[in-house]
Amino acid sequence: MDNLKKRNIFFNDLNFILDCCNSFRLYLALCNDDSFIQESHNVILNEYNDRVQWLSFPSDNRSLFSFVENNIDSSKVTIVCGLKDNVDIDHVLATMNVIRETFYKFNLPIILWVDKSIMSKFIRIAPDFYNCTGTINLE
């Protein structure tokens, strides 16, 4: 899929989420193209900064929930990148699955950038949470 088509899909979905979703929902943005993710980050910083928060999950952090809780701006949809670089992603996903109900305390949707490897792990390690997610397929 070319970048123009990816951009149309991602930003159409993001605009829908911004306009229609006013409670927590987890979305997985499936993309293996780091340059497209960076391009999207730049667009969000320039055009969506008032409504979208972009966070980079540290490679050594073991709790996505705590990371988001400590960094979230509750008035903005949150996008998190960096999961593929996490050194203990299996633990991160297993913990997310166990405490999935606590994520519902967040007021707005969260979008996680994932690649095929992380998506496969999500399905295998956090199936209950995965079944409650929406997917933005950019492959």
Question: Which residue ranges define each predicted feature?
Answer:
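Extended, compositionally biased accessory segments flanking or bridging domains
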Residues: 1-76
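Short linear interaction motifs
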Residues: 8-12, 90-101
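Short acidic, S/G/P-rich loop/turn micro-motifs used as interaction or catalytic elements
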Residues: 33-37, 58-63, 83-90, 117-120
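Conserved P-loop NTPase "ATPase switch" module shared by AAA+ and STAND
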Residues: 71-92, 96, 105, 109-116
